[in-house]
Amino acid sequence: MRHYEIVFMVHPDQSEQVAGMIERYTGSITEAGGKIHRLEDWGRRQLAYPINKLHKAHYVLMNVEADQAVIDELETAFRYNDAVLRNMIMRTKAAITEPSIMLKQKEERAPRREAEAKEFAAE
């Protein structure tokens, strides 16, 4: 089995369905004997450039270990799902399990935002 990093972007109007999509895709990987090493839901983020006249999308990152047949199945699922705007599947040399830079930045900003909210509420 090979290691892959998968990133897909979902239409912002379909953000509620992202949890179901993640469950479906991870289920197909694990049913085929694959493993999920890292799963991150980055949430709705600004796009670098408009895609289909959209300026935001919901991002999901997965690092998996799976067979090529499972990856082909995922690629087909992404292609025929209208809610998936873009996807990228890259083969990696080893399993990546540490949090990504995006998640680290999000975690660093959370306490600062809470402190700012408390200051604003106190005023």
Curated annotation (Swiss-Prot):
| Example of a GO biological process term | translation
Keyword rRNA-binding attached: yes
Question: What Gene3D superfamilies does the record point to?
Answer: 3.30.70.60
Quote a single Gene Ontology cellular component term.
cytosolic small ribosomal subunit
What UniProt keywords are attached to this protein's entry? Ribonucleoprotein, Ribosomal protein, RNA-binding, rRNA-binding
Originating species? Vibrio vulnificus (strain YJ016)
Q: One GO molecular function term?
A: structural constituent of ribosome
HAMAP family (alphabetical): Ribosomal_bS6
Ranges for the region named Disordered are 102-123
InterPro entries attached to this UniProt entry: Ribosomal_bS6, Ribosomal_bS6_CS, Ribosomal_bS6_sf, Ribosomal_S6_plastid/chlpt, Transl_elong_EF1B/ribsomal_bS6
Disulfide linkages recorded for this protein, renumbered to the chain, are: none
* Family annotation (PANTHER family): MITOCHONDRIAL 28S RIBOSOMAL PROTEIN S6, SMALL RIBOSOMAL SUBUNIT PROTEIN BS6M
Give the function comment from the record. Binds together with bS18 to 16S ribosomal RNA.
Annotated PROSITE patterns? RIBOSOMAL_S6 (PS01048)
Q: Where is the composition biased (Basic and acidic residues)?
A: 104-123
**What NCBIfam families does this protein map onto?**
S6
Name listed for the protein in its UniProt record: Small ribosomal subunit protein bS6
Keyword hit for DNA-binding: no
Q: Per the similarity annotation, which family is this?
A: Belongs to the bacterial ribosomal protein bS6 family.
Q: Name the coiled-coil region(s).
A: none
Pfam families, alphabetically?
Ribosomal_S6
